[in-house]
Amino acid sequence: MNYEQAMEYIHAVQWAGHKPGLTRTRTLLAALGDPHKKLQFVHVAGTNGKGSTAAMLASCLQAAGYRVGLYTSPFINRFNERIQINGQQIPDEALVELVEQVKPAADAMEDVPTEFEIITALGMLYFAQQQCDIVVLEVGLGGTLDSTNVIEKPACAVITALGMDHVKELGPTLADIAAAKAGIIKPGCPVVSYGGAPEADTVLRRVAAQQNAPFTEVDFTKLQITGGDLDAVTFSFDGLDEVRLPLIGSYQPRNAALAITALRVLRQHGWNIPESAIRTGLEQVSWPGRFELLRHSPAFVLDGSHNAHGMRATVQSLKDRFPGQKFVFLVSIMADKDVDEMLALLAPLAERFVTVTAHNPRAMPAQTLAEHIRAYGCTAEAADSIEAGVARAEELGGEGPVCALGTLYFSGDVRQAFTRLNA
């Protein structure tokens, strides 16, 4: 088997009328020798900020001298990004070997595992074989029934900002969504929550109390944002002063405060994480596709916000970093998202829009999206391809800023097109 064949196998596994649940993942991992039982985890769930928070946690744990696995989704440029150790993506050869180990076990199962379940098994096997000290494990969707939730006793469960997303799968209210995320809270294991949504916080606190799990909520009164430019945002939090964070979204210091709180809880539970390692980890963190500046002048921003909750944070970042400026927006949005709410947030900042169709079956066609946008009194035109969209947005933007956003699923394509066009 080569890399292409391994990828083909992973992506060919379709969700064919599967019932959600952990049985398949447990069966598959048992056939592989239960690699997850040899590992320690920080489990990260939430609506927005999961990936950024996970990247910060992994970077700080690595700076503290640990061998750290990082499991995230989706990828931006290449599948291998989803499974990393100490910032290094899994090598192609290693991935092929793992697929060769996992495939026979999966094929032998009566109820065939889904793509995400296969990938979870690949990650667990790799991290165990590579003897990671700790793994930062990002939930795919929800919590309770997510395949990552086979882990029994995390060193810490971390719940990021909660908002309305995936309502079809998780339920129509914030309390329903919180209940799904609360599934990662395990008996006696510490929980650290972002908080800030009373309806959700009540649910999380109740579940933590039922599970006898020590519960900590981030104290944002101790967070001061002291500076921000196109290279870094500077903040102080609860005794850790003037940290220079290279993730420039205005919302990132809040994710960092969550990561710091979780790392300090881990320290209370015996992990050796000096404050100096937390600072180093945060100042060295990299997380592409989240309010990322591909070029300073004229500015080209790439952002992955894909629901109204995330879009609100991105719009605030655009206002903070580019005061008084209007943008050419390059957008693609999944048809099952709160499209109108997202567009209503963007419209006041828009010079005009260029729409494209991301390579995802759920993506709203560019033409349909452009019609939606015109209903807000904005100028919008549809491009035939992502590359044509990037070229047109750059042309319309002239010396002004361009921002590509609406889904993580087109970030990689936008970056590649941008690189080709500016080579």
For each feature predicted by the language model, list its residue ranges.
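ATP-dependent carboxylate-amine ligase catalytic core
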Residues: 18, 22, 26-37, 63-152, ...
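Beta-strand->loop->alpha-helix junctions that form or flank phosphate-binding loops
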Residues: 194-195, 207-229, 246-250, 278-284, ...
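C-terminal helical cap/extension that packs against the catalytic core
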Residues: 197-216, 230-234, 299-302, 308, ...
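Acidic, Mg2+-coordinating active-site environments of NTP-dependent enzymes
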Residues: 110-111, 118, 131-134, 138, ...
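A conserved segment at the C-terminal end of the G1
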Residues: 44, 52-69
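Charged, amphipathic alpha-helical linker segments immediately N-terminal to NTP-binding catalytic cores
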Residues: 1-16
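Nucleotide phosphate-binding/pyrophosphate-handling subdomain across enzymes
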Residues: 37-38, 134-137, 145-158, 162-166, ...
